[in-house]
Amino acid sequence: MAKQAKAGAARRPQRGRRRERKNVPRGQAHVQATFNNTIVTITDPAGNVVCWSSAGASGFKGSRKSTPYAAQVTAEQAARKAMDNGMRVVEVYVKGPGAGRESAVRALQATGLSVIAITDVTPIPHNGCRPPKRRRV
C-alpha cells in the first residue's frame, strides 16, 4: 500500500510545455541598446513576443556585452529564430544610446529579413529626472 502511494507521488504532470511554432510572416524587431547590453526582441504586429535574444544570452560576459559585435551576434540569433517561425518582413524599432544600434540593424538585414522601416523610439525626457553624475576616470 505504501509503495503505491509513493509511485503515484513521483509521477508529476509535465511542467514545461513544448513551445509551439508560430507562423508569423511579418512582425516587429525591437532593439534595446543600453550602455551595458543589447536585447533584440521580435514580436508579431500585435506585440506578442515570438522570440528574443540578448548579448548575455549569446554567451558574452561583462564589458564584452556592450560591443557592436555582441549586438550583431545577438541580432543574427534572434533573426534566425524568427525565420524558423516563418517571419520574412520586419519593422525595426531602436531604443537606447548603446554601441550596438547600427550593427544590430545591419545584422537583421544581412540574415535575410526584409527591413521595411527603421524607427528610433529612444525616450527623451522633457527635463524629467536628473541624469547620473559625470564619471571621473
Curated annotation (Swiss-Prot):
Disulfide bonds: none annotated. InterPro entries: Ribosomal_uS11 (IPR001971), Ribosomal_uS11_bac-type (IPR019981), Ribosomal_uS11_CS (IPR018102), Ribosomal_uS11_sf (IPR036967). Residues 1-11 have a biased composition (Low complexity). Residues 1-32 are annotated as: Disordered. GO terms for molecular function: rRNA binding; structural constituent of ribosome. Gene3D superfamilies: Ribosomal protein S11. This is Small ribosomal subunit protein uS11. The lineage of its organism: Bacteria, Bacillati, Chloroflexota, Chloroflexia, Herpetosiphonales.
